[in-house]
Amino acid sequence: EWEAVGQIVDAMGGVWFDVPRDMYYSDPLQNLYINQKAGYRLLTGDDAMQVLRFRDGANGYKDGDLGRIKTQQAFLTAMVEQLLKIENIAKINEFAEVFRENVETDLTLQNILWFAKAAFTGGLKPENVEFVTMPNTPAYAYSSTTSRLNGRYSEQSYVTPNTSQLLELVNTKLSPYAEVFTR
């Protein structure tokens, strides 16, 4: 759940991030309002969620959804770097509780706390966290949702998976098995 990211940001006391562009969007149908100025500053959980959700097809990223994905990855990188600072170890119980409330798992709270403590005490380093984007082909479509809001159609960005490259990614980055997946 993306909402957990905002809750963790608030528990951290905010995340310093360079918002790459002005972000304005209003969608009363979804009760979604985004109003973020470009620049480096401390983001609250709500600010972070606005930055992560922004995609406005008409006024959004030049490279569509791929631009949004790059911003999301840059934000999560900044968040992990700041989260793992030793001063945040005092907030470990709060982080574990947010995780427990938002992630479906059979781990006990004790298990979650054990993994969190291991991460904070050197088991996880920001330079070892890698984000990858699903291999894809960009696609565009006209949205009728936007037409209801402002009386016109708007081009929306989407991606479609490239299955052969996706299998290669699974085999080289994600699979713990020696066996190669072929389908």
For the regions a language model picked out, list residue spans one by one.
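Flexible, polar/acidic helix-loop-strand segments at domain edges
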Residues: 6-94, 98, 177
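Short helix-initiation/N-cap motifs at beta->coil->alpha
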Residues: 1-4
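C-terminal solvent-exposed extensions
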Residues: 104-183
